[in-house]
């Protein structure tokens, strides 16, 4: 539950205070004191809220209020207190007897602030504006000497390092490791082209000195060494153009 309002707004007056209301408020406070501001309006016969009565008394009707302009000493004191306390006007007013916080705030915004700006002083920091501008323009964005020295040392160390593989040529073609093994196996086995060539050459007539020509029966393997064979004098029998000794595996020993 929030705090209840100090008055019923439907039955209170608003706006400027009249002379009669000021006289009633002053007469009641002189007779009974300030007391409780919530119950004071009803006791004094005023159709005002307690907050309105309090502000009217403190800011306008107090007998110890100072009237007139601020003096030079008060101006200096306000500037010094503002540099220490900032915009805490109630604390500043407590050190200026007879002056209210609202009065001091209005005087600061209308007179003192402009006076400080005219003197070249920042009203927030209370420092010379020219000095602040110089400090801003002299900001250097160059790297610190330690950082520059570290970067130079790192560059020298990188340049001093020798390459690990100076003779490495990345353009070389790398053959698969099984190529050499395949070449060896091909050398051990007779080529199919060689066998085919042997067959073709065996059926041709080059004379008896080169193996001789085979007859039709020997070339088909039907007759071997028959009396009518004209190629019986050749070394070994031929079948399909191959000598018989080439296909004879009886002399080989089984491992």
UniProtKB/Swiss-Prot annotation:
Protein name: Myb-related protein Zm38
Lineage, opening ranks: Eukaryota, Viridiplantae, Streptophyta, Embryophyta, Tracheophyta
Listed Pfam families: Myb_DNA-binding (PF00249)
Keywords: DNA-binding, Nucleus, Repeat, Repressor, Transcription, Transcription regulation
A GO cellular component annotation in the UniProt record: nucleus
Annotated InterPro entries: Homeodomain-like_sf (IPR009057), Myb_dom (IPR017930), Myb_TF_plants (IPR015495), SANT/Myb (IPR001005)
Positions of the HTH myb-type domain: 9-61, 62-116
DNA-binding region: 37-61, 89-112
Any one GO molecular-function label of the UniProt entry: cis-regulatory region sequence-specific DNA binding
PROSITE patterns referenced in this protein's UniProt entry, alphabetically: HTH_MYB (PS51294)
GO BP term, pick one: regulation of DNA-templated transcription
